[in-house]
């Protein structure tokens, strides 16, 4: 209820700021040196308030759903407080007007996401939480390095122009890659599915994974980026979109398919930023947040019906047992595909038009187009499994409570209407394209070709062993977990209260000293070839721009 009231208040503030076209900066001076003032700065403009409205709206729906989903959990009160802290950290990051405030929200997101992913007491949840934490720590180091570069060059600790210091722009971009799960930092995103489903709905829609995209959008609005950064972001975004779609096409875990679709859409947003279209990326972020939250809430209802079964081969014929849930999921899938007259159509289709209209790299454009084709294919595949697949699990009948209805129906309405609604509210989201009819026919052909392939293709047992293993995420996930393996053992001993703190810390420091070296000694022959090819592709992409 409180989040709903805050959402309404922020909505009114957004309308006032949008009509006045004004911004406000609130600063609290912490301390000063001879040349630098360290301030806690909060910026309130139409971008930050609109994104905060989206976060609070989705959070209120997720909390309403979690009240029923976690009702039988013995520690649901603790879960609720951690989730509130997670939303508060995201709010601080959204309103941050300086790098000092940004670090406060960034660290808060990292710590609370660690606690939420490790909520269930098992090895899979603990290892996934450590993987997420270590990836975010890499981003923390890069943000602090950016902070140091800005201080050395004599700039302010507020967001400086992005092109002013080339080194700081590189560090800040790579830090955003870690938070937005761009390749090669994508390993933690599927692993975060070990968290409860309400956490997944909040993380994958509007909070943790979109934080990096939002920060880059905020910097792009101050000033553009160096030309080299556009090439790098285009290459990384197209690779992320392509790899996320290719793995989701052969995955049988329901939640992982949805997580990999998030990975694919994050690549779309990054590619939009590489075209210097920050407002269009923000519009796609808003639409994606709505239908992805509804998609995860629908998956949570399916898990409640099937007693926790996530294998798509055991689920099927849900169209007859729970037509309302499947109808809402199908709406989400149509939004994911960019079907006409839904929210993502007004952003995703326009991104593709601008890509064809602008002088873009041919190599990255083809990868991005192929990733878009795979998006429609795995969406149709998921709909086929859930609606018309063989029912081998005998799920119970789903009688949706009022809490489930109140949490999903507003998201369903906004998933369809948010794209056109945001264009009406703010003309900044309107981007015109002068592409020819031939280009439009190509885009429509890609959409309907993906639907056709998704309907007619049959997937054998050979493909999952090759593609759904996510072998391209192996280096980062294996080595980060290898680094924290000793931490998992010592945490278990601390929980059992069978060790003295001094003994734990001495062994921990001894083990971590050589574990750090293992991070740099993992280049075996096959991985050396993989990284050589990746570096070669990046160099060729920059040269061909």
Swiss-Prot record:
GO BP terms: ATP synthesis coupled electron transport; electron transport coupled proton transport
One MF annotation (Gene Ontology) recorded for this entry: NADH dehydrogenase (ubiquinone) activity
The enzyme's E.C. designation: 7.1.1.2
Cellular compartment(s): Mitochondrion inner membrane
EC class of the enzyme, as a word: translocase
Entry's transmembrane regions: 1-21, 47-67, 79-99, 100-120, 141-161, 162-178, 195-217, 230-250, 263-283, 285-305, 322-342, 360-380, 406-426, 442-462, 525-545
Reaction(s) the record says it catalyses: a ubiquinone + NADH + 5 H(+)(in) = a ubiquinol + NAD(+) + 4 H(+)(out)
Disulfide bridge map: none
Keywords recorded for this protein, A-Z: Electron transport, Membrane, Mitochondrion, Mitochondrion inner membrane, NAD, Respiratory chain, Translocase, Transmembrane, Transmembrane helix, Transport, Ubiquinone
Pfam families: Proton_antipo_M (PF00361), Proton_antipo_N (PF00662)
GO cellular component terms given for this protein: mitochondrial inner membrane
Topology of this chain in the membrane: Multi-pass membrane protein
Summary of the function given for this chain in its UniProt record: Core subunit of the mitochondrial membrane respiratory chain NADH dehydrogenase (Complex I) that is believed to belong to the minimal assembly required for catalysis. Complex I functions in the transfer of electrons from NADH to the respiratory chain. The immediate electron acceptor for the enzyme is believed to be ubiquinone.
Family assignment from sequence similarity: Belongs to the complex I subunit 5 family.
Protein name: NADH-ubiquinone oxidoreductase chain 5
The organism's taxonomic lineage, starting at the top: Eukaryota, Metazoa, Spiralia, Lophotrochozoa, Mollusca
